[in-house]
Each structure stands twice: as C-alpha cells, then as structure tokens.
Amino acid sequence: MPRPQKCRAIAQDPEYRVFGPFCVGKREDEALVMSFDEFEAIRLADVEGLYQEEAARQMQISRQTFGNILASARKKLGEMLVLGKMLNVKGGNIMISQEERIFGCAACGHQWSLPYGIARPVECPSCSSQNIHRMSPGGGFGGGRRGGGKCRGFRSGLDRGPGHGEGRCQGEGHGNGNGNGNGQGRMRRNQQEGGEV
C-alpha cells in the first residue's frame, strides 16, 4: 500500500488554468491535467529560476519529490506543445502558503490585507460598509475558497465570482457566482395583488 501523499505548499492559485492551441475542434475532455503542485514546480524552477533544493523547501517537500513533480510537469508541457493538446491546471493535495488574505470593499474601493488565522472582517475599516469580499491575486473580487483544514485537496474551480443577478419582476436581484445569478428581487405591491404596475 503506498504512503499517503503529503500536502504541497503553493504560493497562490494559478491565475490562468486552461491552455491549448487556438483552433477549433479541440475537446476539453481530451485535455491533459496538470496538478497545482506541478504548476507550482514549473513556476519555481523555470520562471523564478530556483534550484531544486530551495524550490522543494518552499513547497515543503523533499528534493527528490520536487524533481519527480517537475519531471512530470515538463512532460505534460512537452506533450501540449508538440502534440497540440489542451492542458487544464486543477487538483492536487495542496495548501496555500500565501501569508496574507486581501480584502476589498465594493462600496468605497478600499483594499487591505490580513494574515491567515485572523477572523474575516465584518466591515470595511474605511467606510464601515459590510459589502466586503476577498480579492483574487489579480486584484478582482473572487479570491474566496471553500474547504477547511490544512490541506484543501483536489480542488478545481472553487473560486467564487462576484455574482450578477436579475430579479424577477421589478426589483434588485442578488446573484451567486458568475453570469446570471439566482436573484429573487422584490415585487411591487400592485403585482402581488394581481394589478398592473
């Protein structure tokens, strides 16, 4: 029986998760899957230029394990480029090692950060609005995550978007996620009684 896989620390979720040739006819179900830890290994070794020993220390794994992850990631990149396959970045037994969470206020635009381990703020420190959200690394709303515990494990696409809803009848909708949300809105009294508005 193999040993359980140890959590791998990554700095942040990748901003882009789907890669491939720009042509019609490529199906996403035939795509290669690169885990978050493989993506992080490519980032540390090839983009940041770190030696494997230092990169392994940052991911909190052994140098040998880092080398295996890096070799697997490079093989998938090669297949994507040479064979023209799609590549999806998702899954893996990971934990986010980013030291601070970034929050933003939708009312006044104020941004601030708090270290992990401190409770989520209830209101904006600038304007006291309760319309606050986690910010993604790129600066937009939607950096929140589900899951609990130290390792998040096999995540894919769990970031929540800002939400845009359209209410029924005349009223304001409240959306969940990207696109049209599940807004309910408020009906005017005349409509509730069957009259015209």
Curated annotation (Swiss-Prot):
Signal peptide: none annotated. Residues 138-197 are annotated as: Disordered. Residues 172-184 have a biased composition (Gly residues). It holds the Pfam family DUF134. SUPFAM superfamilies: Sigma3 and sigma4 domains of RNA polymerase sigma factors. Residues 157-171 have a biased composition (Basic and acidic residues). InterPro entries: RNA_pol_sigma_r3/r4-like (IPR013324), UPF0251 (IPR002852), WH-like_DNA-bd_sf (IPR036388). It comes from the Bacteria. Belongs to the UPF0251 family. This is UPF0251 protein CT1277.
